[in-house]
């Protein structure tokens, strides 16, 4: 199964659906779903996902290189792994999504959207995670969902962590720093993301990794993510990652800007970078007689997008943590 990406993009079902790799067994489950199981017993399970948005190709290419290293035997596998290429049709078309944003649908929220390829895929991925986690007795469960951002950022690589009732484990946060993440953003409320679903329903330590900017296939400079690729390789093979890194800055979400109607106006232009700072009192958005302003001394914007569909998030406002 050294052509997993090509099969996924072409929508082709492989003639052989399971086999042996270098020290592991592989099993093709469905388009964009591949299970890897080490020959030796392990108590760690990992979801490695990318391509939830079809125009975010750099992480997909990174995963393809990791799979090639595993199949060649140059990388040892020490986790049970479910590799997920989230939205095959959008990936093949080179678009963010075909009908609706899948990363708003998880946790059963797909039932609130008009039926589409994305709603069916979200349901399939939920069932796939349930089967994967329930078929083993993993003591450690991680989910790393790899993305790229629509626009540029003051932090080239950053992580977004779902709301979680329990404290985050220090080794997980340390690994995120070793993977080159310059900032970590902590959600304070539930959401429909893939990582919130895996965290809430399966207790996984989950993070959305934002790696650079969305570009088409074969136009990505993967060298700018070498530190992340090296950390992923070390993780898969059970090797300790470097401790010589600067701890990521930490932010938490303090509010969400939501577009409710065509009267919505977001006062940020296309050049506004993620993590741009705004002073207290700054007018951020208006919709009819409703005004959205900065309420803390300083707030930072994340994912500003004035053109989202009505009812969806047009941006998050953050505050820095000590």
UniProtKB/Swiss-Prot annotation:
Zn(2+) binds at residues 53, 56, 147. CDD domains: M14_ASTE. Binds 1 zinc ion per subunit. The active site is at residue 210. GO terms for molecular function: hydrolase activity, acting on ester bonds; succinylglutamate desuccinylase activity; zinc ion binding. Keywords: Arginine metabolism, Hydrolase, Metal-binding, Zinc. It comes from the Bacteria. One of its GO terms (biological process) is arginine catabolic process to glutamate. Belongs to the AspA/AstE family. Succinylglutamate desuccinylase subfamily. This is Succinylglutamate desuccinylase.
